[in-house]
Amino acid sequence: MASPNRHWPSMFRSNLACNIQQQQQPDMNGNGSSSSSFLLSPPTAATTGNGKPSLLSSGCEEGTRNPEPKPRWNPRPEQIRILEGIFNSGMVNPPRDEIRRIRLQLQEYGQVGDANVFYWFQNRKSRTKNKLRAAGHHHHHGRAAALPRASAPPSTNIVLPSAAAAAPLTPPRRHLLAATSSSSSSSDRSSGSSKSVKPAAAALLTSAAIDLFSPAPAPTTQLPACQLYYHSHPTPLARDDQLITSPESSSLLLQWPASQYMPATELGGVLGSSSHTQTPAAITTHPSTISPSVLLGLCNEALGQHQQETMDDMMITCSNPSKVFDHHSMDDMSCTDAVSAVNRDDEKARLGLLHYGIGVTAAANPAPHHHHHHHHLASPVHDAVSAADASTAAMILPFTTTAAATPSNVVATSSALADQLQGLLDAGLLQGGAAPPPPSATVVAVSRDDETMCTKTTSYSFPATMHLNVKMFGEAAVLVRYSGEPVLVDDSGVTVEPLQQGATYYVLVSEEAVH
């Protein structure tokens, strides 16, 4: 090991020489020892033979000219605060240049020397190390006392080997950082370099994070006592009353077993099922408070998109009429009249004059009333409007009416309408107890006047589950699909298959039936 006083300032050498000379002066004067006179020059000889002052005499004179502080130095509170701040910042073993700067900073509050600063840092490190050792010893005894009661199972006893029992336990995490800094400072004492402990602290935090997220191994007899204690005590779970933040969420959290976490998929399923199961209760709360007129408006509003699609189909058909009416050679069909007719029917539907209950009532009349020439087959519509007051509630509210008060065909379609309720409710078309609109099909009646070469069209909306009587448009009327394929009818003129939902049909009517 190098000399411990190699970095000491020069004042210690001068003071040591003066002390030795003062102790040897009585022997020189009293006994006249030759050895004393040989080692030390007499006090009267201030210079050597060549006229230069001796080392010891010059040191004493320097000590008398520049008085140094006493060996026992009592720092002031201001100086202690400065030193503590420097020590806590990470400089636990300052070099010689830093000691001089610190001494100049401390001299503003009182006389201090370089040696005082050096020894203060050494004593401060020793006190820190002693505190850490005492704290680790205290926690070691506390864990050893709690180990047999906490980690051992009730039926078996864990016997630790001598090597594991003699192994030093890991100190608490709050003291681990300070212990690392003290050990690094003690290793740097001989070299005199100042190394910061921040890299060591960063490495410690990284290793601690890895230790926290690593899986816990199975407890065996080869593990230290502290690891057995930690692994046998999992993290306590929060109670149910701490997790529940609102009365609405209590039914969701209490029906699941307590666990450390719940996957996001399961949580989403719980919330989705809860909102789905609560929807029918809200819908069936007030089923009889909605009037038929309000439900009629909801039906028309929900089918606005379907009516727009019907208009698009009419536009396509008008642009290529020979594709549908190739059997009757209606090439002079006017697209403007077709679009205007659809627009008028759309306005009637929004005003409540044309809805899904009209077609069923009109189908019961085998002989419709025909108006004068140039009227566009409006008789089924007018007959249906006259009977709309009696059949609106039966078609819109199938669950609140009786079979005796409704026609037979209305009762037949009520069961089919009931099957569509749940699907429309789940689709979000209805809100708060409104009844869903029944499925419908669009029928467009097309007639052509051979004299004026003008084509007239009229659009109707019928329930999709009914069998349409084509003869209501005339004895020679023909029903075709939008692709031009004719629809099969029986001898009485009723379609063999019911109308398809959302489909568009065309009725080819001769002008004689209109007159």
UniProtKB/Swiss-Prot annotation:
Pfam families: Homeodomain. Residues 23-32, 44-57 have a biased composition (Polar residues). Residues 130-143 have a biased composition (Basic residues). It comes from the Eukaryota. Residues 62-71 have a biased composition (Basic and acidic residues). GO terms for cellular component: nucleus. GO terms for molecular function: DNA binding; DNA-binding transcription factor activity. Residues 68-132 bind DNA. Residues 23-76, 130-156, 176-195 are annotated as: Disordered. Coiled coil: none annotated. It is found in: Nucleus. Keywords: Developmental protein, DNA-binding, Homeobox, Nucleus, Transcription, Transcription regulation. Belongs to the WUS homeobox family. Transcription factor which may be involved in developmental processes. This is WUSCHEL-related homeobox 12. It comes from Oryza sativa subsp. japonica (Rice). The lineage of its organism: Eukaryota, Viridiplantae, Streptophyta, Embryophyta, Tracheophyta. The gene is WOX12.
